[in-house]
A protein has these predicted regions:
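Charged (often Lys/Glu-rich) extended helix/loop segments that serve as interaction or gating elements
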Residues: 16-158
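Acidic, glycine-rich loop-and-beta core segments that form the ion-binding/anion-interacting portion
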Residues: 1-17
Length: 158
């Protein structure tokens, strides 16, 4: 597919293309559950961050699809854009988002962040003592999929 697209370009000589399509192939393979430790207006302080499984959310600013885990409680229909801050107190432990979540999210709520891909677990560090080696395997539908058969759905992409 990449070669076919390159051949449609109107240039005399194609450059050598080197790519690693890993994210496109396995983005949907992983998600993580984070806990909200503190909320200050549109800032959520969570128990994971860029030194944990969410590196790509900070440095290249990938906006992970997110959903509140409701545990049966009523959630607001009003959605709000949030920034995330990780637990390390380091200025790099920040994820700009926007992460669109219900307006009534509060401390001790849980959020699923999807599309971690192959590198979520690989990039984890033990910086400032925050590290967990607990991994649980569950099966569920992805938070968001690029393979959705219903093309009438639209997603906010930042």
């Amino acid at each position: 597919e990449i070669k076919k697209s390159l051949n449609t370009l109107k240039i005399d000589k194609l450059p050598e293309i080197i790519c690693e399509p890993g994210r496109a192939l396995v983005a949907e393979s992983g998600s993580t559950i984070v806990r909200v430790n503190l909320r200050k207006k549109q800032k959520l302080y969570i128990n994971d961050g860029t030194y944990g499984t969410l590196f790509d959310g900070g440095v290249p600013n990938i906006v992970y699809p997110s959903r509140l885990i409701t545990n049966g409680r009523m959630i607001s229909k009003k959605m709000t854009a949030f920034d995330f801050y990780g637990p390390t107190c380091d200025s790099m432990d920040y994820m700009k988002g926007p992460f669109i979540l219900p307006n009534n999210i509060k401390e001790n709520d849980y959020i699923e962040l999807g599309q971690l891909g192959a590198y979520g677990l690989t990039f984890r560090t033990q910086f400032n003592g925050f590290y967990s080696d607990k991994i649980f395997e569950v099966e569920d539908e992805p938070v968001m999929t690029m393979y959705d058969k219903d093309k009438s759905k639209s997603y906010l992409v930042a």
